[in-house]
């Protein structure tokens, strides 16, 4: 095991230095409490990173989309990450990973985590940001505009990436969980920040590929906020086949009566899949949901267990 500690008691004082030192895999990196102001890139598979304490082991950076870089170009969404993962079989436990750049209306998109890999697991982590906190790669198969995907995986293979987020706290405002992965969120808290607008935000923006069995599944999750009632959507389709499914989730009053938004894409009503089953709380209003939102039967919901997800 490799140890990282800011006080010099470990093998390294920098997380990236520890990652770069790995020569034998699998490997585990243990990070002692502290605030590590750096960007971290994970390229090697079968790596595990474990923090000493989820709230006190903090990786943070403040890159953002509207920042003008040395080449005169804007940073853009996909170069704004704090942690970048382009490896399979990566695990992260008991850490905070944050992008501290600020609200999206001021700085644009600002990713805390860019996760593009198969068999990625985040457990007991806190992912903090504002707009586009967590990108669950891969990217959509086609850009909406030229250069929109500029970043570390713009030319990568568009393949199925399966990811699990368990017992995590994820915070943001607009589209703060987005991408094309099949991602399962189990017992997580999704916290929407108040930007004093209506709508105040969107939790998810899936770009699930056509014919992909799973997009986003939220199981036993808690949707919380400091926003006024009826101001936040559960999601909207970044691409027309986007999927977000909620199973037995707690929805507070900030959730919009309609539940989901169509991103002004009426054609997505027949292709996107937004659904709920056995949800509860002040924001759970099946009778007021948009026409394209489905309420699942018990048999249909049985296809969205973690076991079924892993099988596929």
Model-derived segments and their meaning:
Residues 1-312:
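Sequence-level preference for short, compositionally simple segments enriched
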């Amino acid at each position: 095991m490799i140890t990282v500690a800011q006080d010099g008691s470990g093998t390294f004082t920098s997380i990236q230095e520890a990652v770069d030192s790995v020569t034998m895999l699998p490997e585990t990196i243990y990070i002692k409490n502290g605030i590590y102001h750096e960007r971290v890139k994970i390229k090697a598979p079968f790596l595990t990173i474990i923090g000493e304490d989820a709230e006190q082991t903090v990786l943070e950076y403040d890159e953002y989309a509207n920042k003008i870089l040395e080449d005169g170009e804007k940073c853009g969404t996909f170069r704004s990450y704090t942690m970048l993962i382009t490896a399979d079989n990566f695990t992260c436990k008991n850490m905070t990973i944050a992008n501290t750049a600020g609200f999206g209306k001021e700085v644009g998109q600002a990713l805390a985590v860019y996760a593009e890999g198969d068999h990625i697991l985040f457990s007991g982590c806190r992912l903090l940001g504002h707009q586009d906190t967590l990108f669950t790669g891969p990217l959509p198969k086609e850009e909406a505009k030229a250069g929109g995907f500029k970043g570390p995986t713009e030319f990568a293979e568009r393949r199925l990436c399966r990811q699990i987020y368990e017992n995590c706290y994820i915070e943001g405002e607009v589209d703060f969980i987005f991408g094309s992965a099949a991602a399962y969120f189990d017992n997580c808290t999704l916290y929407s920040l108040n930007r004093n607008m209506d709508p105040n935000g969107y939790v998810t923006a899936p770009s699930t590929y056509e014919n992909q069995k799973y997009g986003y599944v939220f199981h036993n999750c808690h949707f919380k906020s400091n926003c006024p009632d009826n101001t936040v959507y559960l999601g909207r389709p970044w691409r027309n086949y986007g999927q977000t499914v909620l199973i037995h989730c707690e929805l507070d009053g900030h959730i919009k009566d309609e539940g989901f938004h169509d991103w002004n894409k009426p054609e997505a009503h027949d292709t996107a899949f937004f659904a709920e089953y056995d949800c509860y709380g002040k924001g759970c209003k099946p009778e007021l949901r948009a026409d394209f939102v489905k309420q699942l039967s018990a048999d249909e919901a049985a296809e969205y267990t973690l076991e079924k997800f892993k099988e596929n």
